[in-house]
Amino acid sequence: MPGEIQFTVNGKPSAITGDHPHLLSALRDELNLTSPKDGCSPSGQCGCCTVLIDGKAVVACQQSVDACEGREITTLEGLPESERQQFADAFAACGGLQCGFCIPGIVMRAHYQISKKGSSLTRESMAPHLGAHLCRCTGYVKILDAIEAVAHGTPVEPPTVKSGVGARGMKY
């Protein structure tokens, strides 16, 4: 890759100078953005590296850095803190995560769908979009519960754990 590739990442002008096989590598290795995860690169099968490019949800391991010249890229780090907290609370309250590796990509896809459909987003309309994501721990019912809660603005109470070593913890 000759020269420098410039684009906007999370609202800030950025430049990539290294040679990267795909956008995911550039985001993680050169820009130190760790929310896009590498679960399968470069096959694009797991959705863990989903980001927004010009507002559209795409997997970063399938995007060349050159193709991103002059474009707007948003990772989970670029969403407002209040929105990230809303997703975090909903996923925790609904039991929509276990290891959490896939969640940043799923949240970016959910954010994209909510930005398009708002509160009219239903679990039935969201479910096909989760086909682009592999969750090996939780399954999709609780993930859809969390996304639906965010889309509809349903207040959720994140679980509180009041226990110590050897005590029983709360189970979702």
Report the location of each language-model feature.
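Signature of N-terminal electron-transfer/Fe-S-associated modules in redox systems
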Residues: 1-172
